[in-house]
Amino acid sequence: LSSARSFLSQSDYESLVEKANFYGSPLEFTIVGYNSNNRKVGPLMNTKWGQEGGYSALCPNEYPAGCVAIAMAQIEKYHEWPQSFDWSGMANDRPTSASQSLIAMIGKAVNMEYGKDESGASLGDAKRGFEAMGYAVSKKDHDMWDVESEIYFRGRPVYMTGDRKNFIGITWKGHAWVCDGAEEYG
């Protein structure tokens, strides 16, 4: 089991030691299977942007930028498209005037509904916003194969959304995010 330290996380290793001890198995005779064919891609993006903390400085009343705008902005930063933006002027870990301009422009493009506590836009508006900026967009249901395909084979982050529904079917509290990595266990 001690050789498993080279490929297991500390917590996984400790869990195996605990199980081996529980069952009275000598550690030197405990076998751990390892598949070196696991495939991991990502994270593809380096940006760590948020809806507030300076990123919303150019939004109306400095209300939160909205998850739609932040997710779209990070994807656009990854592709550095459209070319009209100062991509080199955008830091990955803090707001700059260039990233603030991009986020505000996306907010306008998606008809962002700004609010004091949260801001939002629909999936349809996000799709039209991407298309207006020169992106080819296809709307699909969440399908892990499609998501992994985009990440593994095309090296592209995936814009995703989810909605929560109450018991009578009224949609509320949607959210948008980017999936920019995946791990496949063989």
Placement of each model-derived feature along the sequence:
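Conserved active-site-adjacent core of cysteine acyl-enzyme catalytic domains
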Residues: 88-186
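Active-site-adjacent structural segments surrounding the nucleophilic cysteine of cysteine proteases
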Residues: 1-119
